Swiss-Prot record:
Assigned protein family: Belongs to the ATP phosphoribosyltransferase family. Long subfamily.
Record HAMAP family: HisG_Long
Protein keywords: Amino-acid biosynthesis, ATP-binding, Cytoplasm, Glycosyltransferase, Histidine biosynthesis, Magnesium, Metal-binding, Nucleotide-binding, Transferase
Protein name: ATP phosphoribosyltransferase
Functional note: Catalyzes the condensation of ATP and 5-phosphoribose 1-diphosphate to form N'-(5'-phosphoribosyl)-ATP (PR-ATP). Has a crucial role in the pathway because the rate of histidine biosynthesis seems to be controlled primarily by regulation of HisG enzymatic activity.
Record-level GO BP terms: L-histidine biosynthetic process
Activity regulation, short description: Feedback inhibited by histidine.
Domain of life: Bacteria
Requisite cofactors: Mg(2+)
Annotated pathway: Amino-acid biosynthesis; L-histidine biosynthesis; L-histidine from 5-phospho-alpha-D-ribose 1-diphosphate: step 1/9
Organism per entry: Pasteurella multocida (strain Pm70)
Enzyme Commission number(s) from the entry: 2.4.2.17
Any one cellular-component term (Gene Ontology): cytoplasm
Length: 299
């Protein structure tokens, strides 16, 4: 296969993960015109091609070197890795960064009216799942024998349909489980999205572009986790007020016009500033407190 000079990134073609992946690239300054029916999109301002595919195809495309990067849920990534390893294949890739979206958990659930005293209750149970290898690894670690019922969709209906005693499926809010008369009893895996790279070495130009994207992603994620705080503080209360601000290193102190008793403080806080903290700041003597979102950060 001829090596493309453009960086190829695989991402999910539809759904929430697709939307969040698109938003991340946009925040990183990648201009892409994504049309609903097009499976390949081209960046307007960078040598980047976006391949929009099924999520469970993304790990294989990266493992096999068809694409350079992939944005994928860790649950899908590790399930495919375990599948290939079980078939005797060697899996090589680089996990570049965990991303701050796509969070979910892979859990075992049973009918709500059944008692549950621990994982040993599932001995010899038939468990329906779309993640047989992650489930098998967990149950082996727990020393519990079970039977697998592999399904590719609608896993939550398996107990009612008489196909299984329990299920192992992705859970976000738990509403789907409740709607199907199930309750969560074991969390076996916690997942977020991640950025992965093929193992084969990239050209210097491509690697430089990957490094640039990584720097921008780091800046986007740091900005999302940070707030820019401005306030007025009495000079004698600076130390007390600074101690109340979470994650602050070196505040910028500026004089105030026409008031020598106070200064202006500008700080970047690496943690969320809650109402309780703002009330504590006010009680300590701070005034004119502003908390602003940060769009981008670098350095």
């Amino acid at each position: 296969m001829i090596e493309s000079k453009r960086l190829r990134i695989a991402m999910q073609k539809s759904g929430r993960l697709s939307q969040e992946s698109q938003a991340l690239l946009k925040q990183c300054g990648v201009k892409i015109n994504l049309q609903e029916q097009r499976l390949i999109a081209y960046a307007e301002n960078m040598p980047i091609d976006i391949l929009r595919v099924r999520d469970d195809d993304i790990p294989g495309l990266v493992f096999d070197g068809v694409v350079d990067l992939g944005i994928i849920g860790e649950n899908v990534l590790e399930e495919e890795e375990l599948t290939r390893q079980a078939a005797g294949e060697t899996v090589n890739y680089k996990k570049l960064r965990r991303l701050d979206f796509g969070g979910c958990r892979l859990s075992i659930a049973i009918p709500q009216d059944e008692a549950y005293n621990g994982i040993s209750d599932l001995k010899n149970a038939r468990i329906a799942t779309s993640y047989p290898n992650l489930l098998k690894r967990y149950m082996q670690q727990q020393g519990v024998d079970f039977k697998t019922c592999s399904l590719t969709g609608s896993v939550e209906v398996a107990p009612r349909a008489g196909l299984a005693d329990a299920i192992c499926d992705l859970v976000s809010s738990g509403a789907t489980l409740e709607a199907n008369g199930l309750k969560e009893v074991e969390i076996i895996y916690r997942s977020k999205s991640c950025l992965i790279q093929r193992a084969a070495e990239l050209s210097p130009e491509k690697q430089a572009l990957v490094d640039k994207l990584l720097t921008r992603i780091q800046g986007v994620q740091q900005a999302a986790e940070s707030k820019y705080i401005m306030l007025h503080a009495p000079k004698e209360k600076l130390e007390e007020i600074t101690a109340l601000l979470p994650g602050v290193e070196n505040p910028t102190i500026l004089p105030l016009a026409h008031d020598n008793s106070k200064v202006a403080m500008h700080v970047v806080s690496q943690e969320n500033l809650f109402w309780e903290t703002m009330e504590q700041l006010k009680d300590a003597g701070a005034s004119s407190i502003l908390v602003l979102p940060i769009e981008k950060m670098m350095g």
